[in-house]
């Protein structure tokens, strides 16, 4: 039974013969709740440490994923990502017809081995966000976006003007919800 939006329930989908875990607000949550990252400082660590965001879009019912450099800001308690690229292309065409998207970032990936094949794996932090994408047209927002992107990618502040941002497209991705995960190294890893 769900009492508030932080409670969980398990739902059986007979047609798929499997169970799904769902938050009471309707969002699917991760199976390994012991690995879920909920502390904002840890989530910020993931966002600040990762350099590549994988942008997932849907093109005529088919998945389309593209790796991109990114920047992010918090606006009105919403996480907003910015990515940039050419002024024309497939991803812009897709966003114009279907703005639904997801993003994925990982960092601190460290492979480890074991005595048997099933003990091999990777320690990592990961972030998955779900929301909508839109193409930014306003020069001032493009300047803000490019500044955020360069700060994450280089740790430096750069000056932009309308002429510089007029030659790139900027995509704004507003996350409606997200999850983050940490898979630690095993107790006695063979690294």
Please provide the spans of the model-predicted regions:
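Short, intrinsically disordered, mixed-charge
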Residues: 48, 88, 96-101, 148-155
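Short beta-strand segments
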Residues: 50-87
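Helix-adjacent hinge/juxtasegments
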Residues: 90-113, 118-120
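Short Pro/Gly-enriched beta-strand edge/turn motifs at strand-loop
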Residues: 37-39, 49-54, 153-156
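Extreme N-terminal tail/first-helix region
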Residues: 3, 10-49, 191
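Charged, gly/pro-rich active-site loop segments
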Residues: 25-32, 108-191
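A generic structural signal for short beta-strands and their flanking turns/coil linkers
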Residues: 51-53, 66, 77-79, 97-101, ...
């Amino acid at each position: 039974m769900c009492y508030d939006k932080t409670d969980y329930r398990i739902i059986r989908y007979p047609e798929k013969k499997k169970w799904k875990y769902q938050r009471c607000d309707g969002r699917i949550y991760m199976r390994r709740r012991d690995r879920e990252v909920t502390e904002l400082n840890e989530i910020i660590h993931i966002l600040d440490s990762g350099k590549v965001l994988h942008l997932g879009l849907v093109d005529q019912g088919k998945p389309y994923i593209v790796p991109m450099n990114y920047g992010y800001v918090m606006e009105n308690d919403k996480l907003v990502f910015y990515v940039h690229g050419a002024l024309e292309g497939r991803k812009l065409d897709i966003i114009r017809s279907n703005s639904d998207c997801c993003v994925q970032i990982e960092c601190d990936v460290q492979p480890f081995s074991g005595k048997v094949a099933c003990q091999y794996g990777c320690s990592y932090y990961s972030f998955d966000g779900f929301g909508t994408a839109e193409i930014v047209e306003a020069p001032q927002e493009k300047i803000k976006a490019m500044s955020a992107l360069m700060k994450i990618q280089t740790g430096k502040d750069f000056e932009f003007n309308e002429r510089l941002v007029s030659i790139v497209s900027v995509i704004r991705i507003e996350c409606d919800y997200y999850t983050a995960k940490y898979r630690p190294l095993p107790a006695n890893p063979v690294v």
